[in-house]
Amino acid sequence: GFEGPLRPRAFDARKAAGVSSSPFEAATLLKNASVDFGIWTTDKAMPALARDSDGDLLLFIHDGEGDLFCDFGHFAYREGDYILLPRGTMWRIEPKARTVSLLIEAINGSYKLPERGVLGPHAVFDPAALDTPKLDAAFKAQRDGEWKVQVKRRGALSTITYPFNPLDAVGW
C-alpha cells in the first residue's frame, strides 16, 4: 500500500489526442525547457508541410501506416517505427490508416546515436537497422503547385507559401 500523497499514475495517452492534420496541434502530455512530449492522431494527408525550428523531432508510430515525404525523400512508415526529423526539416505524412504518434521534441537540442557498446542480438541499438528516405518514384510524383509550410519557431507558428512544392530534392 501507499501512504501519503505519492500514488502510482497510469493514463491512456491516446484518449488525450484529438484528430488533427497538423502535428503542431498535438496534445501535450509532458513539457519542460528541454523536451516536449505530445500525442498526435491523424487520419488524412497533411494539407501543409511542417518545419520545426525549435529542435529535432522524434516520432514514434504507435498505430497506423502511411508515407512520409521530407527534404530527404520518401519512405513508408508503419506501427513501431521511430522517425527522426532533424531541426529545420520540411515534412508531411499521408496516412494509409489512422496514425497515432508520440512526438518527442528536443527543444534547443538534438538527437545523437548512442555510444557503441555490446554488439549482436543483445545490443541496445543496431545502427545497421536504420533506414533513410529515398528519392523514389513516389517522391518525384508529388503534387506540384502552391504549398504552404507551417514553421514553428520559439513556440509560435508562421506560414510560408511557395508557388511550387519545396520538397524538390534531386540528390543528397
Model-derived features: positions:
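Jelly-roll (double-stranded beta-helix
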Residues: 1-172
